[in-house]
């Protein structure tokens, strides 16, 4: 399911980004990690938010520097690539219909079943670091992760963004 609206997001650096509802997926059907990343990258490309090299950059970076995280009972991933592949800052969100395997961040050998993906497409490296830190804070709250996983509508997603101050 795809969304239709945009929600503006302010970061610590005063930079404005968007959670575009056209690249927000609830119950994304993906056969594996690569399929999920390709679908999300394609949605960013179709919205003219990233360059044609963004998908390749995300896939290559994921191979070298895995982004899978095991947080309590949840598996999630925060894939991203270099800022030169970004036209306009964006964060794509997907909850997956069925979990897919990602390799664990910091340990390229172990895998985690991922059901939530936050794909970062940010123009400035400092924004990327700031957003990664903010997301890591959010990921420490199991209740919030459960709410993201159970989110089925744009309205619920929008309310959740407001709750975690990513509105």
Which residues fall in each region the model found?
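Cytosolic covalent-transfer regions centered on His/Cys nucleophiles
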Residues: 1-167
């Amino acid at each position: 399911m795809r969304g239709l609206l945009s929600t503006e997001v302010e970061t610590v650096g005063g930079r404005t980004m968007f959670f575009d509802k056209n690249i927000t997926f609830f119950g994304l059907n993906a056969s594996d990690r690569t399929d999920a990343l390709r679908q999300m990258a394609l949605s960013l490309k179709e919205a003219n938010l990233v360059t044609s090299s963004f998908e390749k950059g995300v896939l290559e970076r994921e191979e070298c520097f895995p982004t899978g995280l095991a947080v309590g009972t949840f598996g999630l991933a925060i894939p991203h690539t270099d800022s030169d592949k970004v036209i306009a800052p964006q964060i794509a969100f997907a909850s997956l219909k069925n979990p897919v395997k990602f390799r664990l961040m910091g340990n390229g050998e172990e895998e985690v079943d991922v059901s939530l993906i936050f794909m970062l497409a940010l123009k400035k490296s400092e924004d990327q670091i700031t957003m990664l830190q903010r997301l890591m804070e959010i990921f420490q709250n199991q209740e919030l992760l459960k709410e993201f996983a159970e989110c089925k509508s744009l309205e619920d997603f929008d309310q959740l963004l407001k709750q975690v101050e990513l509105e």
